[in-house]
Amino acid sequence: MATTVRSGYSGTPLARKLGIKPGHRVHVHGAPDDYARLLAPLPEGVVFARRAGADVDLVHLFATAREDLAKRLASLRKALRADAALWVSWPQRASKVATTITEDTIRELALPLGYVDIKVCAVDAVWSGLKLVVRKELR
């Protein structure tokens, strides 16, 4: 029997929090070593893509450095479909992981690219996540 890992405080499985649906193509960058365990159980037919591109439904990007995040956001904005979801995760302050990113930093970098944030969640005890989508008028 598969064990369901509950992420954060809600008791909701992480894959559901992130909106991963059956048949989705997902690209993950910089995830912690136990990410596969955190996502379990995955919906049927989920495929992990090596690269972010027009065929990807959801990207989960983990970042600790503002400069790296700025570059990746700009690159992803060009590569992804307008209806793809982009989750950006950063270390929570209480985690003591060195970072130059906060929730406000993500907004500061993403909003000028045409993204808007629509959801926030705890990924695990270290990482928080902010869901970004392209503004409706730009889709």
Please place each PLM-identified region on the residue numbering.
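N-terminal, charge-rich interaction modules
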Residues: M1-R37
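Class I S-adenosyl-L-methionine
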Residues: L113-R139
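Mature catalytic domains of secreted/periplasmic carbohydrate-active enzymes
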Residues: L38-L42
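Conserved class I S-adenosyl-L-methionine
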Residues: A94-T105
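Short, glycine-rich nucleotide/cofactor-binding loops
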Residues: V59-L69
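Conserved beta-strand signature within the Rossmann-like core of class I S-adenosyl-L-methionine
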Residues: A82-Q92
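Short acidic low-complexity segments
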Residues: G45-V56
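A short glycine-rich, Lys/Arg-flanked "PGG" loop and its adjoining helix->strand segment in the class I
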Residues: A70-A82
